[in-house]
Amino acid sequence: MNRSANPEAASSTSHVKFDLGKSVDISSTDTKDGGTARSPLEPADKSDTTESKSESGSDSRSEEDKESPASIKEIKAETPQPKDRPGVQIKLSWSQKIKSWTAKKKRKLYQLVIDIIMMNRVCKMFRQGLRGFREYQIIEPVHKKHPDFSFWDKKKQGRISFVTEDFAAQEGHFPPRAISITQKKPSWRTHQEIQDLCNILQALDCYRSYTESLQLLLAKVIRFERFGRRRVIVKKGQMGNSFYFIYLGTVAITEDEDGSSAFLDPHPTLLHRGGSFGEMGLLSTTVRSATVVCMEETEFLVVDREDFVANKLGDEVQKETQYRYNFFRNLDIFQSWSEEKLWKLVALGRIERFSYGQMVSKDFMNSAFITFICQGNCEILRLVALGDCSAYYKWVWQQLELLDHKPLRIHDNEISPKERFKELQIKSYPLQDFTYLKLLRLQKAREQQGIDFHGKINKVENTLPKLLGPKIKSRFGHLVKCSMVNTKFGELPKEAIVGVYMKIHKTEEGEIVGLHQAFVPEIQRDCRPFILLSLGSELIQVRKEKFYDMVDEETRAKIIKMDVDYPSDEDLCQSFLKENDYIVFRKDLLRLLVEPLNKSPFIPVQTKKKEIYNHKSLFLDLCSLEKKVKQHYPIFLAPQKYLPPLRVVQAISAPRHKIQELLPQYKNAGVLI
């Protein structure tokens, strides 16, 4: 029986010898027979040499130094071998180990450099790919330590908790807890869950228009759906089975079946968050007359036909339809229309609600819709580029004369013939005075008429034109050094190229917007863009081409008669400059009279809090054209079709005299004489 197989018979001692300066050698000693187990991977002759070398390992260090380099540089180690495998002997020279270690080190360093380069390239590719998303800030959801809070209720003798995450919605999406409620059957929803859904749906304008009892019924039967871009929700020619509320996203209404025209039409019929569609198809058995397609990822709240009929939601839809009919019937323009024709017009439009300050149309002149004002008011605005108006050009240089003391004609591009002739005279005879020639001619003319001329002219000294002497003082101020922009009237400072929104008209209930110059030849039309801004209104929008198909001669004559011309940009610019002069004068006067009285030396100066709005954002200061001061406030830019964005202002402060110089009664600050 082999004693090496018995773990107790194995040698309990192992000899490990390290000589870092020499070599590394690992060998195992056998028990009793002194034999060594040979590795099956080594030949027999090699095992013999290994035994002879292991015996010489017990010599002194001085003898090891004298031996050959192959057998000298070694470190011997004797370890017990497991019973299931023979002893293994590994011998490598020190030079080989150094080379292998250096190669491994270089290989790892090279691999590390390659990994770093690869990571940099990947990061660069991600940055280039995400260039379009720089406006958005990607925030990872942070785990909250205490996502809910609770308090003790004395009446119920229990703790009431409120979980904030159940009601949290990201980027306007439908809350997850609300989605889980809508996935239940209507009969399984509790009263509290229905009330929670009703509170969440208050964000939709069309939902708020219903009565409270009907809102609870809708919250009980409603279900949630989410569809991606280009998904057709309602197809033309099919039966309608559902009624949709738009919670998030945008849909388009088209005439084709696949909805592809919505992505090609420059002015598609769009419905946004808070809109609804599909209710008319549930009131009758007729097929759908239009296709509804998603323009982006959209979230819907859907009411099916059986729930729609069971909860008598059709009565509310009929009320809205009757409301539109009554509105159109009361307008003078439709008094001659028949009932059938008017009901067709009612089917073409739908009621939309816009909050205060919400833009209805960027350019209703080129829009595809006609807007009827049912309730509330709207404003018609015009963005006037002041740099394109001659009145503004003259006004700017008149104000800047206080800085450079140069007349307006110097900055003109075109010079009148009279001014051109004067310049020719000055260039031909520079710095010369011809006043004596006029006096001589005047004296001769009066002598011929027999009129005595008092005063004599020294002809000897004035035979030649005299040069301008030091008595004539030229008044030149410092030059205004700033970047200039060429306009059709001349040069203007770049900072002075601004725009202003001017209110043209305020609409009332019953007015129609979008029929301005509708039947005027296209060459004679006013193609300027006009903005329609809501002040809290309820509107009905109808497509122009469908409305024009229904217009008869009598209605056309009424439309032409009610047409009104809008003022030109030049008139709007002049009215703005007049109003601006009054605004600036009023501010200066209030500052002169009121501010000195409000100052108190005993009140410590308090640091102003940072605010979102800064009055300097909408204020242009022509006095600081030369000052290169970094602006610490935002400015508002309005996009233009073929030109760079235009800065929008509300007032312009120009160089001006002090009020004390113009009005002596305000000489002392805070005192009116």
From Swiss-Prot:
A cellular component annotation (GO) from this entry: cytosol
UniProt binding sites for a nucleoside 3',5'-cyclic phosphate: 206-329
GO terms for MF: cAMP binding
Entry keyword annotation includes Nucleotidyltransferase: no
Knockout consequences: Males are either infertile due to a lack of sperm resulting from spermatogenic arrest, or subfertile due to impaired sperm motility. The motility defect is caused by altered Ca(2+) regulation of the flagellar beat of sperm.
Gene3D superfamilies found in the cross-reference section: Jelly Rolls
GO BP terms in the entry: spermatogenesis
Compositional bias of kind Basic and acidic residues: 43-86
Annotated Polar residues bias: 1-15
Membrane spanning stretches: none
Region Disordered, annotated ranges: 1-89
Keywords: cAMP, cAMP-binding, Cytoplasm, Nucleotide-binding
InterPro entries: cNMP-bd_CS (IPR018488), cNMP-bd_dom (IPR000595), cNMP-bd_dom_sf (IPR018490), RmlC-like_jellyroll (IPR014710)
Subcellular location: Cytoplasm, Cytosol
Pfam family, one: cNMP_binding
Role: Essential for male fertility. Plays an important role in spermatogenesis and regulates sperm motility by controlling the development of the flagellar bending of sperm.
This protein's name: Cyclic nucleotide-binding domain-containing protein 2
Native source species: Mus musculus (Mouse)
